[in-house]
Amino acid sequence: MSIEVFNESGYDGVNEEMLIDVLSFALGEMDIHPDAEASIHIVDSDTIAELHVKWLDLEGPTDVMSFPMDELTPGYSRPDGGAPGPAMLGDIVLCPEFAEKQATKAGHDLSHELALLTVHGCLHLLGYDHVEPAQEREMFALQNELLADWYDDVDRRGVVYQPKPTGPGAFPTAADRLELDQTMIAEEQGEPGESGASAR
């Protein structure tokens, strides 16, 4: 895979090598052509808030956004999958400032949160979504499976990034993330007991 990272956030603590590793692994597991290209943009809260409004008409910053370029179906290495050739998959945009707040609430570190969000963004590039409940369950289950398998792969290779977290928020269901989103929105609005709605 050809993956470029552009860190425009000025944020310390972002392991770019780890982000490339987890994205490469996820794409490989999804049978995407090994010469496919993608990019990861790491931005500040103001930048992702602008993108959030421009593309989704939603106010405020968010954790991850994806901008697919080529429509393709996973299955490059399947006998019946054909060989579509290399593709420019698109861009994943991450906001570590926002992600760190989520990580703290979920009980793990920023690096794990960014790995999780990178896999989430990767699946969006490949056409997965979570608009309908069935889609949501499928996407989050696959996200957690890929992330857990990546940790196992890293361990087999003897590579050290962050330790694999074991807390309940480390491999969240869609309901877990919705609850986290609602908690953060309520706190930002100064209403810790109330909940709102958020879309990624």
Swiss-Prot record:
Main enzyme class: hydrolase
Cofactor(s) required, per the database record: Zn(2+)
Record-linked InterPro entries: MetalPrtase_cat_dom_sf_prd, YbeY, YbeY_CS
Gene Ontology BP, a term: rRNA processing
Pfam family membership, one: YbeY
Function noted in UniProt: Single strand-specific metallo-endoribonuclease involved in late-stage 70S ribosome quality control and in maturation of the 3' terminus of the 16S rRNA.
Family listed: Belongs to the endoribonuclease YbeY family.
Source organism per UniProt: Corynebacterium efficiens (strain DSM 44549 / YS-314 / AJ 12310 / JCM 11189 / NBRC 100395)
Alphabetically ordered keywords of this record: Cytoplasm, Endonuclease, Hydrolase, Metal-binding, Nuclease, Ribosome biogenesis, rRNA processing, Zinc
Compartments where found: Cytoplasm
Name by which UniProt lists this protein: Endoribonuclease YbeY
HAMAP family from the UniProt entry: Endoribonucl_YbeY (MF_00009)
SUPFAM superfamilies reported for this sequence: Metalloproteases ('zincins'), catalytic domain
Keyword hit for Hydrolase: yes
EC number: 3.1.-.-
Gene Ontology molecular function terms on file: metalloendopeptidase activity; RNA endonuclease activity; zinc ion binding
Positions bound to Zn(2+): 120, 124, 130
Details of cofactor binding: Binds 1 zinc ion.
Upper lineage: Bacteria, Bacillati, Actinomycetota, Actinomycetes, Mycobacteriales
One Gene Ontology cellular component: cytoplasm
Location, primary (coarse class): cytoplasm
Domain of life: Bacteria
